[in-house]
Amino acid sequence: MSQQHTLPVTLPPALSQGPLKPESPPIDTQQEQVKQPTSLPVLCQKMPSSLPGKVPLGHGEKHTSLVKGEPEQQCEPQEQEQQQKQQESQEQKLHLEQCLEQHQEQQESQDQKLYPEQCLEQQQEQQESQDQKLYPEQCLEQQQEQQESQEKELHLEQEQQKEELQQQEQQQGKEQCEKHQEAKNLEQQLEQIGAQRKQQQKEQLEQEKKLVDQHLDQEPAQRTEQPEKKEEQVLEQQGQQEGQLEQPAFVPAQVQVREPLKGEVLPLIEQQHQKQEVHDPPEHQ
């Protein structure tokens, strides 16, 4: 429930200056009121007519104007004055109440224009308080129903919040699983790539090793073939030289006899030395 806002009530200047005086009725009406017969007061009715000069005990102060021989109707002006005063006071009260009501209504209308929400809340609170006074059981039932509806709404909100939290947790778990699976797949791919590279390097090394082995296997055969060829060449050269030495000294003019020079003997020595190397090949380290 919202707090009640008490609004100040200011009286108009006409009311704040003093009590309002009722408008005096016209002279004709006053005369008519005087002419109309009024009922005698109780004191005047009970006054004995046999003793006109005596005043009853206890009423000397009120009826001091009574004189011997005067009629009982002299009490009427005093009664009329009292009635007029009472009527004037009642009219003043009514007029004041009306003015206050009007001023209050004006103030409420102004407040409604200035503060419509507060005024509505005040009206609702007033209506509820009145309803509680008039229909307490119904108000209690309404309050219980409102409380139950509020509790239901709170329960529903809590359930919705729980469901949302569960959904968020499930989504987060799913995302984490996906990330973990992606990381695992990436790791597997990297391992496969590394294994493939290792296999390729291993195969390449094996091929290179095979080529080296083949080359090493071929080298001794080449080495043995080369000395044999050299030996054949040396033998051919020796045969040619021997044939040249056995030829006659006299040859046709066209053929010139070529004597072996000193520089040609050295190759023969070198050939013999090479033959020895072929027969005794050096040891492989």
From Swiss-Prot:
Intracellular or extracellular location(s): Cytoplasm
GO terms for cellular component: cytoplasm
Protein's name according to its UniProt entry: Involucrin
Region of interest called Disordered, as start-end residue ranges on this chain: 1-93, 120-256, 266-285
Claim: Cytoplasm is one of the keywords in the record: yes
Matching InterPro entries: Involucrin_CS (IPR019743), Involucrin_N (IPR019571)
Basic and acidic residues: compositionally biased ranges: 149-165, 175-185, 200-233, 272-285
The family this protein is said to belong to: Belongs to the involucrin family.
Protein's GO biological process: keratinization
Record field: compositional bias (Polar residues): 27-39
Keywords from the named record: Cytoplasm, Keratinization, Repeat
Post-translational modification: Substrate of transglutaminase. Specific glutamines or lysines are cross-linked to keratins, desmoplakin and to inter involucrin molecules.
Organism in which the protein naturally occurs: Canis lupus familiaris
Function: Part of the insoluble cornified cell envelope (CE) of stratified squamous epithelia.
Tissue-by-tissue expression: Keratinocytes of epidermis and other stratified squamous epithelia.
